[in-house]
Amino acid sequence: MASDSSFPGASSNVAEYSVSEISGALKRTVEDTFGHVRVRGEISGYRGPHSSGHAYFALKDDRARLEAVIWRGSMSRLRFRPEEGMEVIATGKLTTYPGSSKYQIVIEQMEPAGAGALMALLEERKQRLAAEGLFDPALKQLLPFMPRVIGVVTSPTGAVIRDIIHRISDRYPLRVIVWPVRVQGDTCGPEVATAVNGFNTLPDDGPILRPDVLIVARGGGSLEDLWGFNDEIVVRAVAASHIPVISAVGHETDWTLIDLAADMRAPTPTGAAEMAVPVKADLQASLASQSARLSSAMSRFFDQKRQAHRAAARAMPSADQLLALPRRRFDEAASRLTRALFVNTQKKRVHFDGHARQLSPRLLQRRLVELERGVTMLGQRLPRALEAFLRERRTAFTHRANRLSPEPILRRTRLTGSTLEQLDRRRDQAVRLLIERVKRRSQELDRLMRTLSYESVLERGFAVVFDAQGKPVKQAAAVSPGDALSVRFRDGDVGVVARAGLTIPDPTKGQ
């Protein structure tokens, strides 16, 4: 077997390391040599903080890539939220990870690489969100004139919330609900978006009143300080809010993307409070002025109506004047009605007398004699005619009986019987109709008799005068003074004695 000394370099002075030893030596060398460095690069592979709070990503340029990690404590101290593609300057130390022979930078501080890079990123985001319609003026909501509750999204400490509450208390005291958030740093954007969405999910009748308007406020600061309000999640939450939102981020010269998505932008948090509520004293003064104007207008209105009423009352005729013409027309109509009733009664009496003369007993007796003679002649002719008819029908029947079989006869008999039944029913119906017609005619004649009778005249307030023999008195000239008369009214007779007096003229003679 060959000796170990046969291998090249076996007896050299090169030190021998284990894998762990060489990895540890490299780690110490890197950390000692690059204990504190500043690295400029573009963020790549950023997915937000891990569940542990740490963030893992890489910094790259056009020729190399450096793995990076930010521990949870350093992550919470960042003044902006890292985003994919953002160019930053990271401050930290280099180290290696022996388990995979990789080196990385542990970032302690990080800031955007100049305002130009942030502005370029901001402009790109602005154009993209505008193309989606999130800044469309048609989506803007009107602020309520007199809100009941105002929701404020800001830091619970500092001058901003104190200025807002103080200004609201001075102008129009009402309930203010504060949703505390961080207004700077990596978690600023998500917390503001959560607050806006949380206010929108409050029910109208819940234990916490739903605000009528929201104020998202923060004091002034650099572009990096205000970067959380340029976060896309904040812009989308404000644009989707069903509650009107006032943006009051930074000073008047500062602007963020939330200003474009909000329904109203205020130059300062104090200005936002002034936009949200009116001045109570101004409202009271306006109410008093409007009330005075209304009272004055109502007073003038009632004065005008009173004057118009008095003028109308003076122009209106009295009741006697209004009724004079109708009364005259009524009297004339009553007079014409009396004459018309008298004339109509005379005409009906003449017509009735004519019919009565036609129905004299002599004429009726002659008519009855003629009818009896006719009936007697018919009675004499009927037996002979009936016997001849029966002989003829019997002969025809015998002749047909010899020619026909029983079956057709039976069918014809049944058919004839059915026809006879139908004829019977039709006869009964015709008789009923005739009886009804006669009855109606009798009723009409009865009504005519009652109409023509003088008793119907008595029902209308007239009276009939009879002499001592019970005959009606038709003319005043037929009555002598001292004659006993009977006056028949609707409900009975009254005996009277005639005496000399004026003769009432016949009203028909004046026509």
Curated annotation (Swiss-Prot):
The Swiss-Prot or TrEMBL record annotates one GO molecular function as: nucleic acid binding
By its UniProt entry, which CDD domains does this protein fall under? ExoVII_LU_OBF
Give the E.C. number(s). Answer: 3.1.11.6
Q: State where it is primarily located.
A: cytoplasm
Write out the similarity annotation: Belongs to the XseA family.
Q: What does this protein do?
A: Bidirectionally degrades single-stranded DNA into large acid-insoluble oligonucleotides, which are then degraded further into small acid-soluble oligonucleotides.
Q: Identify this protein by name.
A: Exodeoxyribonuclease 7 large subunit
Question: Which source organism?
Answer: Brucella suis (strain ATCC 23445 / NCTC 10510)
User: What is the gene called?
Assistant: xseA
